[in-house]
Amino acid sequence: MSDYIVRATAADANIRAFAVTSKEMVENAREDHMTTPVMTAALGRLLSAGAMMGAMMKGDKDIITLQIQCSGPAKGLTVTADSHGNVKGFAMNPQVELPLNAAGKLDVGGALDLGILTVIKDMGLKEPYSGQCELKTGEIAEDLTYYFATSEQIPSAVGLGVLVDKDQSVKQSGGFIIQLMPFTPEDVVDRLEKKITEIDSVTQMLDRGLTPEQILEEILGDFGLEITDTTETRFHCDCSKERVSRALSTLSKKDLDSIIADGESIEVKCQFCNKAYEFTVDELKEMR
């Protein structure tokens, strides 16, 4: 199993935790979207978060979407995940080039800058659940911590990291989400808060070769950690010519007529994976 998510509990089920390794998923996204290192890190962090938040969904057909709209040069990010470990995503501007930040790290916060994080959960109900918060730092992990606290009222610790190699490929990628359940004893809360301040960053843990299980062991080993589930995860786009055709057929007759009048076949690319689909003039005429 290459990329996978582990789910766990600790402190007599007062703590629930998720951790993921996502190197191949993020490398696939990098290759599909030809992202620069800073955008590989930005999209990679959100893909890791999406994978874990997808694993929180209970229904077979549940879908979660994480959207960031921002004022920085990245312009925005979108990630969609299901409850089976299938994740896809894209950056509005995958070609952002920025100098390293003051700490000598890839400047994800600079690429995103100010903005809004929106989480949409489609659980097959009439209306999807939607929660929103402002970006606190643009570094994504802190923004999600803030989202969980304000929109879902769940005290959480989120850690996300992507290591980019000298050749711009993904060296390591992963993360964790640790959440406190209601009525967690105060001493457990205090001990966990202290522990979170003492641990290495996710990138340091990944660079040491730690697996998701070992990352959770490092954080929750003193809390009676119990791994409850392991799920494979991957970058997977479910686009098809039929789906793209359905999207095209929603264009107005005027717009379709204009495309047809050009007399040439058109190429439409999937935003999530960059796969190109060609439609002939005859195919376009059938959509009117």
Swiss-Prot record:
| Source taxon at top rank | Bacteria
User: Is Transferase tagged as a keyword?
Assistant: no
Q: Can you supply one Gene Ontology CC term for this chain's record? A: cytoplasm
Molecular function terms in GO for this entry? protein folding chaperone; unfolded protein binding
Subcellular localization is given as: Cytoplasm
Disulfide bond sites: C237-C239, C270-C273
Spell out the protein name for this chain: 33 kDa chaperonin
Source organism per UniProt:
Agathobacter rectalis (strain ATCC 33656 / DSM 3377 / JCM 17463 / KCTC 5835 / VPI 0990)
